[in-house]
């Protein structure tokens, strides 16, 4: 149970692929102009990570070490192609919005990195959990950044949610404030860099506060041989 908890905590927070490893910055900065786009790409990446880790782990005993990287890339490309066709079939509006960034998941360092660092050494179910945790950590970072940029840029949240979740999701759209001229800095890549920098700073402050709290609450060590002395 402790290993499962450690995998989840590492993926979601301590070793977050976007906020700690800073991997996959190209889609993170390019696609997160709205919360819907960010959530869509994040969930697609999570699905690819989970299925890829599961497949790589299941085949690890029959994968020659000399050609493992090309095999990993072939597995990732196959999974990404399947996910791309699913999005094209069931969420065509989102498919058009994400464009080239769906097939570019193949080249995402997160996917190859987890296949090499974790899935090639662990069992299938732990590997699938690792992929899911890493993917959800990246999805969370994308969603927060996309929400921040959409609110500051357009004054809305979940605009175009129907392209991801269906026509019923139109009711999810919220207008935080009305604006006739969008705040372009928030919508363009420079705004994504600024938003990501703010998120990194907030995570650092939270981590430092947690370290100080643990240091205060930790019991003081008793030197060996001192117990029982008057």
Swiss-Prot record:
UniProt KW keywords: Cell inner membrane, Cell membrane, Electron transport, Membrane, Translocase, Transmembrane, Transmembrane helix, Transport
Transmembrane parts of this sequence: 18-38, 39-59, 63-83, 86-106, 125-145, 182-202
Paired cysteines (S-S): none
Entries under NCBIfam families matching the protein: PRK12405.1, rnfE
Gene Ontology CC: plasma membrane
Protein name: Ion-translocating oxidoreductase complex subunit E
Membrane topology: Multi-pass membrane protein
Keyword Repressor (UniProt): no
Listed EC numbers: 7.-.-.-
Primary location recorded for the protein, binned into one broad class: membrane
GO terms classed as biological process: electron transport chain
Subcellular location: Cell inner membrane
Keyword check for Coiled coil: no
Subunit text: The complex is composed of six subunits: RsxA, RsxB, RsxC, RsxD, RsxE and RsxG.
Domain of life: Bacteria
Biological role: Part of a membrane-bound complex that couples electron transfer with translocation of ions across the membrane. Required to maintain the reduced state of SoxR.
Similarity remark: Belongs to the NqrDE/RnfAE family.
Organism, scientific name: Salmonella arizonae (strain ATCC BAA-731 / CDC346-86 / RSK2980)
């Amino acid at each position: 149970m402790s290993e499962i908890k450690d995998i989840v905590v590492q993926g979601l927070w301590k070793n977050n692929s976007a906020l700690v490893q800073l991997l996959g910055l190209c889609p993170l900065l390019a696609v997160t102009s709205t919360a819907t786009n960010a959530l869509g790409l994040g969930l697609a990446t999570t699905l690819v990570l989970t299925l890829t880790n599961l497949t790589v782990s299941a085949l690890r005993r029959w994968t020659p070490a000399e050609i493992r990287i090309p095999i990993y890339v072939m597995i990732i490309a196959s999974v990404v192609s399947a996910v791309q066709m699913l999005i094209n079939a069931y969420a065509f509006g989102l498919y058009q919005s994400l464009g080239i960034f769906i097939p570019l998941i193949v080249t995402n360092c997160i996917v190859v990195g987890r296949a090499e660092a974790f899935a090639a050494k662990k069992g299938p179910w732990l590997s699938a959990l690792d992929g899911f945790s890493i993917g959800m950590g990246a999805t969370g970072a994308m969603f927060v950044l996309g929400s921040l940029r959409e609110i500051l840029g357009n004054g809305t949240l979940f605009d175009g949610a129907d392209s991801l979740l269906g026509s019923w999701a139109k009711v999810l759209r919220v207008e935080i404030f009305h604006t006739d001229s969008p705040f372009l800095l928030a919508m363009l890549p420079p705004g994504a860099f600024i938003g990501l920098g703010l998120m990194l700073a907030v995570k650092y402050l939270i981590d430092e506060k947690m370290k100080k709290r643990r240091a205060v609450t930790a019991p003081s060590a008793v030197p060996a041989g001192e117990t029982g002395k008057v």
